A protein has these predicted regions:
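N-terminal amphipathic/basic-hydrophobic helices that include classical n-h-c signal peptides
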Residues: 1-15
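Conserved N-terminal phosphate-binding loop of PLP-dependent enzymes in the Aspartate aminotransferase
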Residues: 15-461
């Protein structure tokens, strides 16, 4: 097993133990049949080895070596309702008996669309897809057709799916940022034609005045502004005062569409997503992950005026598996679960998330570790600060890169994993509706041991 040269060898002391023997064996076997051994590139980054799992239940998951974890990765946020909820499994099973796919219409798609209309402030009309990446592409096409303009404005460091257009400006290296006033349009992948970059404008997050200047400099050319209401994919940065209202104002003033990417935030902070939580109504909304509870399902929802080109048929939106009945059955169960919880829905994840954040910060202080959790609670990022880095909230991508200590976080995560606490490799944590007080209490006990080990090993190195 090769250890990445990006990190010192002591970062992964667990790699030679037997705790992950079966996962290592399967990963080695997979590389003979699966390109790079994984089916999503980011999974290969997991240390000490990409783990293989056998089953999950509620807030817990078990790997093939029999190790149990309190799961705060929770399917990269898709499993808002926890692992293997019985009602959802039953709904999928009952639908499978009736048919797995028709490439036609069924009543379920109307029922799910009607539930989205009930929940989401901006959902006058709905179209279904299989992934949020597809929805992003559909939203961009629709915005350009609606306005007759070529450019999409997005924020530096933001992730909007893995396709060519979604990755523009995602996590650019510091030596290629460009000027603060004019962030460089970069792409992290080879194989993308240069013309794609020319159809985007990049602005810095959480600077309304800067955003105004960028929009004014491209007046009449921008079709839409796309954004995560809380930038969960990059340090869980909440919008500062005035940012969302400025986006709405500029879109109304210049005839641009406001596109909220609620792939992660949808249903997580409130039944109506971040748009309910923060109090705004976008023109188009991208939904994924929790809308399907772990099955491949996504939706584009929006105002009727913004969806008009699809209604007319002048914008192509198609797909053999769009509105798949198995996925619709799962989504109907998920949305009914959210509706049934009512006002209790946000409190469950919010309260537990805040407790976990506070507990992790207290343990960090106890062990002299510069870990600073930030975010709303149902999703948050545990930021490991570099020596001498400033305290306080991180509010934009450049500040995040300057202040984070990625190798040290990776070491701490391996220590947490050994204790049975699973968070996302880059520092993101999710609270599901299946987590309970016992999970938080137990996770903090385990984290105490992990923090102690990390502090000792990091100091010794």
């Amino acid at each position: 097993m090769r250890i990445s040269a990006r990190y010192p060898s002591f970062v992964f002391p667990l790699i030679m133990t037997d705790r992950y023997a079966k996962s290592r064996e399967l990963f080695n076997r997979a590389q003979n049949s699966i390109a790079a051994g994984v089916n999503s590139g980011i999974r290969k980054m997991e240390q000490p080895v990409p783990l293989y799992f056998s089953h999950g239940s509620g807030s817990r998951v078990w790997d093939v070596d029999g190790n149990e974890y309190i799961d705060f990765q929770i399917g990269q946020g898709a499993l808002l309702y926890g692992h293997a909820p019985a009602g959802m499994a039953e709904a999928i099973g009952e639908q499978a008996k009736l048919g797995t796919h028709w490439a036609a219409q069924c009543e379920l798609e109307i029922e799910v669309a009607e539930r989205l209309q009930k929940l989401m402030p901006g959902a006058e009309l709905v179209r279904f897809n299989n992934s949020a990446t597809e929805v992003v592409l559909s939203a961009f096409r629709l915005a350009r057709a609606h306005t007759g303009r070529p450019l999409i404005l997005k924020f530096e460091g933001a992730y909007h799916g893995w396709a060519d257009e979604g990755l523009v400006g995602f996590c650019p290296p510091a030596d290629k940022w460009g000027d603060d006033e004019a962030p460089t349009r970069l792409h992290p992948s080879q194989g993308v034609i240069p013309e794609v970059l020319g159809t985007f404008v990049v602005a810095r997050w959480n600077d309304p005045d800067h955003l105004r200047r960028i929009v004014d400099a491209h007046h009449g050319q921008i079709a839409a502004i796309v954004f995560e209401p809380v930038m969960c994919n990059t340090c869980c940065m909440e919008p500062t005062a005035g940012l969302i209202s400025t986006i709405r104002e500029l879109c109304d003033r210049d005839g641009m569409l406001m596109i909220a990417d609620e792939t992660i935030t949808g249903f997580r902070f409130a039944p109506g997503g971040a748009q309910e939580y923060l109090g705004f109504t976008p023109d188009l909304t991208i939904l994924g992950k929790a809308i399907g509870g772990g099955v491949p399902f996504a939706a584009l929802v929006g105002k009727k005026s913004a969806m008009q080109k699809i209604i007319e048929g002048s914008v192509v939106h198609a797909g053999t598996l769009n509105g798949n009945p198995l996925c619709l059955a799962a989504s109907k169960w998920c949305l009914d679960h959210v509706i049934g919880l009512g006002e209790n829905h946000p409190r469950i994840a919010l309260d537990l998330g805040k407790q976990l954040m506070s507990g992790l910060r207290a343990l960090a202080d106890k062990h002299g570790i510069p870990l600073r959790p930030q975010g709303p609670g149902p999703a948050f990022h545990a930021v490991m600060l570099k020596p001498g880095a400033a305290e306080g909230p991180i509010n934009d991508y450049r500040d995040y890169v300057r202040r984070q200590d990625a190798p040290r976080w990776t070491h701490l995560r391996t220590c947490l994993l050994e204790q049975g606490v699973r968070a996302i490799e880059r520092g993101l944590w999710f609270i599901s509706l299946a987590h309970r007080q016992q999970d938080i209490d137990e996770a903090l006990i385990k984290a105490d041991a992990a923090f102690a080990k990390h502090a000792a090993e990091w100091k010794a190195a």
